[in-house]
């Protein structure tokens, strides 16, 4: 740890690591596999960046978003660390420089997405590169996105083996015990060092309100915003069209806002994010495409205009408020329990469930005609990921699979946890802590169940 502290002080200016960082740094530096569940702002990046500078070889950092990797690389280069990233939005000259640096072993840290890692030009160059370790940042994307629209996540365990089985560190801010087990199994972690910090945020007051009409939902958002005229926040919706419509309505009402979703071009997304971070926009109206890795301490509130699909996503998103330790609020607007007066949440759930069922039906059809062994086929990427999720397929290499005998696959049923959370009479934080494996915890004293107040 002495060498690690020297690097920390020389480059980052800190005399010692935070208590939660020390076991991670020790494990990474000693070549152990690691699974770390740390709240955002817990210093996870430094925990793997410092060890990457203590030994030769390249540390591959697999991260989901271009903005994340570019931000990290810019910070490292300002410290004169040999770091680079690879993604499809780069100019030809920048990409060429990054690729050349792989072959010469120039990079101490190389940031890239799963898709870029497994692309032919990058994969070919990595074969001759000494890989010191791999890092999977935002590891919850493996369980949350890997079998929906980022199927290459499911090939990362095989990629690791093909690269000589370097130590692997997986970091995330939220993961249930079941998801932690899946991450370990799918990545092939061997006797990992596990560090799990409870996601409890004592300064974050959680509120849930029943909505009985679509008009009431709009009014509730307007009233909440009017009560916080000079504060920064985020409004989350489930659909792209919904974000555009609501942002337009609120902008016409005089609010400094715009929409954000994955369907926007890269320039538009970065402009919206930059304007919000700089304070030119009071808030963004966004889908779940926004927020991962964004460290904005000034966020005072988060609104969910609809019930989110899962508690992992919900906890990730409300955790973007109050990172400075000051009081913050998370407001969830849920359709009334019957779904008859306000069917919004029920209709959204049916829409996404139908899409999911269609994906499973496609996977079942693919299974019936796949050979027992075969090569990766891009047109079947999602079906292959679903089969891997259900233990019907193993990746022998990142580009070759083998089917395994197992009972017929069935779509996993969505757990009732989100609706249980909305309807619970317990302290909201007590419910969340239990759902994430934290056991008994005292009431928070701040949520709507503890205070009897919904809106303040």
Task: State where each predicted segment sits.
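Conserved pre-motif I regulatory segment
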Residues: 1-37
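Walker A/P-loop
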Residues: 31-50
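Conserved helix/coil segment N-terminal to the catalytic DExD/H
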Residues: 42, 91-133, 143-147
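Conserved nucleic-acid-binding Ia/Ib motif block in the N-terminal RecA-like helicase ATPase lobe
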Residues: 60-61, 66-112, 194-195, 256-260
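Conserved helicase motor
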Residues: 86-95, 114-119, 198, 237-241, ...
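Post-DEXD/H (motif II) to motif III coupling segment of the RecA-like Helicase ATP-binding lobe
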Residues: 128, 132-133, 140-196
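Conserved interdomain hinge at the start of the Helicase C-terminal
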Residues: 207-238, 244-249
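C-terminal helicase lobe
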Residues: 232-236, 240-244, 248, 252-262, ...
């Amino acid at each position: 740890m002495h060498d690690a502290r020297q690097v920390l002080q020389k480059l980052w200016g800190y005399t010692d690591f935070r208590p939660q960082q020390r076991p991670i740094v020790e494990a990474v530096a000693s070549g152990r596999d690691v699974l770390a569940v740390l709240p955002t702002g817990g210093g996870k990046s430094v925990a793997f960046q410092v060890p990457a500078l203590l030994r030769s070889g390249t540390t591959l950092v697999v991260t989901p978003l271009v903005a994340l990797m570019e931000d990290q690389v810019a910070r490292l280069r300002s410290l004169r660390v040999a770091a680079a990233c690879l993604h499809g939005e780069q100019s030809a000259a920048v990409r060429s420089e990054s690729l050349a640096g792989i072959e010469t072993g120039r990079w101490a840290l190389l940031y890239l997405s799963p898709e870029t890692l497994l692309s032919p030009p990058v994969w070919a160059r990595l074969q001759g590169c000494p890989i010191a370790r791999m890092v999977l940042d935002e590891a919850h994307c493996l369980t949350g996105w890997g079998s929906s629209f980022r199927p290459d996540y499911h090939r990362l365990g095989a990629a690791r083996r093909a690269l000589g089985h370097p130590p692997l560190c997986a970091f995330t801010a939220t993961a249930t015990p079941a998801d932690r087990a899946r991450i370990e199994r799918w990545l092939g972690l061997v006797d990992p060092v596990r560090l799990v910090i409870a996601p409890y945020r004592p300064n974050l007051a959680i509120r849930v309100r029943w909505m009985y009409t679509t008009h009431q939902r709009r009014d509730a958002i307007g009233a909440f915003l009017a009560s916080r005229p000079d504060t920064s926040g985020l409004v989350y919706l489930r659909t792209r069209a919904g974000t555009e419509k609501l942002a337009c309505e609120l902008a016409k009402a005089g609010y400094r806002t715009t929409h954000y979703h994955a369907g926007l071009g890269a320039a538009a997304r970065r402009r919206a994010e930059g304007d919000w971070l700089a304070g030119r926009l009071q808030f963004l109206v966004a889908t779940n495409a926004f927020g991962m890795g964004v460290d904005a301490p000034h966020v005072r509130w988060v609104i969910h205009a609809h019930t989110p699909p899962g508690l992992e996503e919900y906890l990730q998103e409300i955790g973007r408020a109050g990172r400075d330790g000051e009081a913050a609020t998370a407001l969830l607007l849920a359709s009334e329990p019957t779904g008859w007066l306000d069917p919004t949440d029920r209709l959204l759930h049916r829409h996404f469930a139908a899409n999911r069922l269609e994906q499973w039906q496609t996977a079942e059809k693919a299974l019936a005609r796949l050979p027992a062994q075969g090569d990766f086929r891009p047109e079947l990427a999602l079906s292959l990921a679903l089969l891997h999720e259900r233990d019907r397929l193993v990746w022998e290499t990142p580009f070759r699979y083998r089917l395994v005998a197992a009972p017929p696959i069935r779509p996993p049923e969505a757990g009732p946890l989100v609706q249980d959370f909305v309807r619970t009479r317990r302290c909201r934080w007590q419910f969340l802590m239990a759902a994430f494996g934290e056991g008994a915890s005292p009431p928070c004293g701040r949520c709507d169940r503890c205070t009897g107040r919904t809106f303040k």
